[in-house]
A protein has these predicted regions:
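Mobile "lid/hinge" segments at catalytic clefts and subdomain interfaces of large enzymes
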Residues: 162, 195, 382-386
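Fe-S ferredoxin-like electron-transfer domains
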Residues: 46-190, 203-222
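Short strand-turn-strand beta-turns centered on an Asx-Gly dipeptide
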Residues: 6-9, 53-54
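Iron-sulfur-associated redox domains of electron-transfer enzymes in respiratory
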Residues: 16-68, 74-78, 206-570
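Short, contiguous acidic and Ser/Thr-rich linear segments
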Residues: 9-17
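Charged, low-complexity hinge/linker segments at coiled-coil and domain boundaries
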Residues: 197-203
């Protein structure tokens, strides 16, 4: 506890990590380019530089607050200093702003306007670098990189992947994979978190918008869409809807307007995953074999496991992800001439996740050699399509998702938040022993945004020990302990993105603490408002098992990672 003088006003501080946080607490939005509260302090951009009473300047992001400090944030000297920094950054920056995919959301562009930088006095003498579009998930354009280091620290600090780093020195410095390899040839897991923190257009989503428009225009095609749970609590943010509000009904109406023939709910696929994964888990748990069971619905986590811990691949659930279960079932359904009207099917997923773009290409995501899902659009891409079509979001009437795949349980909806898969499985496995008490489950430790959570749940007199992890650096930390025998779990849920899919790499940007919490609570509220709480109580799922899935459960809902690896290596 202490106080400091900021621009002539006394401001008290308690546990703020740096002077920058105290300044913002005082209501002053000091500019930054390289500072993120969840990443390590870098202090490279120097935009947050302030001046003390003796005229000494320092970066406020890397200075601890001290009682009695006197600082100034907006002196003529600092204003000039910040403008020069932006000028120098722009001088070595590709300035095709009007056609840049990040235009309107570019932090560098915003700061140039805010600080009054209208001319750049310096010539750009940098040699252009080739664009790296080798990944199915992201595109890297080094010509738009300002060397802020945010992507490097995200990939290292939070994800523990280290697929990119700084290379070369001085004016030749760039951010690059090792040995300038294409990003697709590295350990990159396609999580897209680098894109989330990139302040410019240097890292962007690899878009499928144009091919989806083409499919919608084809009269000989049935185009169907599935909407993931996390999308419904984020898509409205760009249209003035309160953060975290569930806009599923609006999205269904909008997708119908865009030309999609049928719009379904991925929560239905999540219910199928719960049914199969809970069965698989109980078989292993009762036999005491191949434990822990790791969830496998996050493709970025699956790839991380394959790259770093191949010995744990046999412990991955054989269940397909909700997206892929849904895709296989829907494609089987539309094989029936009564359902396809003689037209070909194009299956599109609306996802919060860039890694889903890679998942649909994996060998184990195909049925009889054919992709079950044709294209993945992220939440951000869907927002772009809505804007291009000129649809006024607030004026679209709410519509229900189409049957037979448009009904999902509350358990399926909470898949989009960390701990949701574990909670959904626990709701299911207590059936026949002790009916799941929702309040008891909520307070068991499955909820909350801690990176690593541990719960012990009583199942018919036996203890189920489970871990819930979000963020791959946290997963790495936990896996090392499991591998060494230091700890043991029966069930481990892993999501690559911190807090789960609500914070996926394909979600809208500018997600501060309030946004993160609002999205998580939005899914929990959607669960509360859903009449069906458990996956096994979904009547549409029950009828599927009695009909289309008879004799085809393993073929359509499961995968073999070992066989898929052989196929990839052919």
């Amino acid at each position: 506890m202490g106080s400091m003088i900021i621009d002539g006003r006394r401001v008290e501080f308690t546990d703020e990590p740096n002077v920058l946080a105290v300044i913002r607490k005082a209501g002053i939005d000091i500019p930054t380019l390289c500072y993120h509260s969840e990443l390590s302090i870098y202090g490279a951009c120097r935009l947050c530089t302030v001046e003390n009473e003796w005229g000494k300047t320092f970066a406020s992001c890397s200075e601890k607050p001290k009682d009695g400090m006197v600082i100034y944030t907006n002196t003529p000297r600092l204003i000039k200093y910040r403008k020069q920094i932006i000028e120098l950054l722009l001088a070595s920056h590709c300035r095709d702003c009007t056609t840049c995919i990040k235009s309107g959301e570019c932090h560098l562009q915003d700061l140039a306007h805010r600080l009054g930088v209208h001319d750049v006095r310096f010539e750009n003498t940098k040699e252009p670098h080739p664009i790296d579009d080798s990944s199915p998930a992201i595109v890297r354009d080094p010509n738009k990189c300002i060397l802020c280091g945010d992507c490097v620290r995200m990939c290292d600090n939070v994800q523990g992947v280290n697929a990119i780093d700084f290379a070369y020195r001085g004016t030749e410095a760039i951010v690059s994979p090792a040995f300038n390899k294409p990003i697709a040839q590295t350990d990159c897991v396609n999580c897209g978190q680098c894109r989330v923190v990139c302040p410019t257009g240097a890292i962007s989503i690899k878009t499928n918008i144009d091919v989806v428009w083409d499919a919608l225009a084809d009269k000989d095609t049935i185009v169907i869409a599935q909407i993931a749970p996390a999308v419904r609590v984020a898509a409205g943010e760009e249209f003035g809807i309160p953060k975290g509000e569930n806009v599923m009904g609006k999205l269904v109406g909008i997708l119908h307007r865009l030309g999609f023939d049928e719009v379904y709910d991925t929560a239905y696929g999540a219910d199928l995953t719960v049914m199969e994964e809970s069965k698989e888990f109980m078989e292993r748990f009762n036999a005491g074999e191949n434990l822990p069971l790791f969830t496998s619905c996050c493709p970025a986590w699956v790839k991380f496991c394959e790259n770093r811990y191949p010995e744990f691949v046999p412990h991955l659930s054989s269940c397909r992800s909700p997206q892929q279960m849904f895709g296989a079932v829907v494609r089987e359904y539309y094989k029936n001439p009564e359902n396809n009207a003689g037209k070909k099917l194009v299956s599109v997923s609306i996802m919060p996740c860039t890694a889903k773009k890679e998942e649909i290409l994996r060998p184990e995501s195909k049925t009889n050699g054919r992709q079950d899902i044709d294209y993945v659009l992220t939440t951000t891409e869907l927002i772009s399509m809505i804007k291009r079509a000129g649809i006024m979001f607030d004026q679209v009437e709410i519509e229900s998702a189409d049957v037979p795949f448009g009904i999902g349980s509350g358990a399926g909806v909470i898949f989009g938040v960390t701990g949701g898969v574990t909670e959904a499985v626990l709701r299911k496995i207590t059936q026949g022993h002790k009916r799941a008490d929702m309040e008891e489950l909520k307070s068991s430790g499955v909820r909350g945004d801690d990176g690593i959570k541990e719960i012990v749940y009583d199942y018919n007199g036996k203890e189920i020990k489970a871990a819930i992890v979000s963020g791959l650096a946290n997963a790495d930390q936990l896996l090392k302990k499991i591998k060494s025998g230091e700890i043991h779990y029966d069930f481990v849920e892993v999501m690559a993105c911190r807090r789960g899919c609500v914070m996926g790499g394909g979600q809208p940007l500018d997600a501060g603490a309030h946004t993160r919490e609002a999205r998580m609570q939005g899914l929990y509220k959607a669960d509360v408002n859903t009449q069906i709480k458990k996956s096994d109580e979904n009547p549409m799922v029950q009828s599927l098992y009695e009909g289309l899935l008879k004799g085809k459960t393993h073929e359509l809902l499961h995968r073999n990672f070992a066989e898929a690896e052989k196929e990839k290596n052919k």
